[in-house]
Amino acid sequence: APKDANGKFDHNNALTGDDLMDFVDGQLFPYLKGFKQRADNANTIEYKIGEIFSEIKNKIQSGYSLRDALEKVDQLRFRSQDEKHELSYLYEAKIKNMGNAGRNGGEYYTPRPLIRAMIDVVQPKIGETIYDGAAGSAGFLCEAFDYLRQGGRDKVKISTSDLAVLQNDTFYAKEKKSLAYVIAIMNMILHGIEAPNVL
């Protein structure tokens, strides 16, 4: 959102109504879709953003409603890992609610206590490959990432090189449904996996 000299939201320069919709649909979404073609390789955050925006469409029909939503989102902070993690929990709660409401989100969501119990039994270790062949929302992978990032069962502090292994060479997923595919990528990014390996 545009800011004034004091870093506050600039209502005078903010697009709204049809102007905002034209910008989002005609410039912003095509630009973000283009990240996929401009990325160095498929294992980058840029590529994944391009994939997400290749799969979704802007469903908001009112530029005024979109402006209101953007102003609310602009007030949120996503700088620290804790803030990103908080957002990831909100995101997963929304997926869970979709399933509870009888919508298709339920087929992508496995209850987190069940996932945590399975992780406690398996006790994955850094250096192992974790694959989910029917990823849904990627809840298993996100919980396994959190478990390993926090040092596993013994809560041993992990090194920078261990974190790089977690980011790049640990988590792999497959999801054939396009909505679940986008949900999985977003969920993994919000949990801190910067370039999810989802096919």
Residue spans of the language-model regions?
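Conserved S-adenosyl-L-methionine
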Residues: 105-199
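Non-catalytic, mostly N-terminal accessory regions of nucleic-acid modification and defense proteins
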Residues: 1-126, 196-199
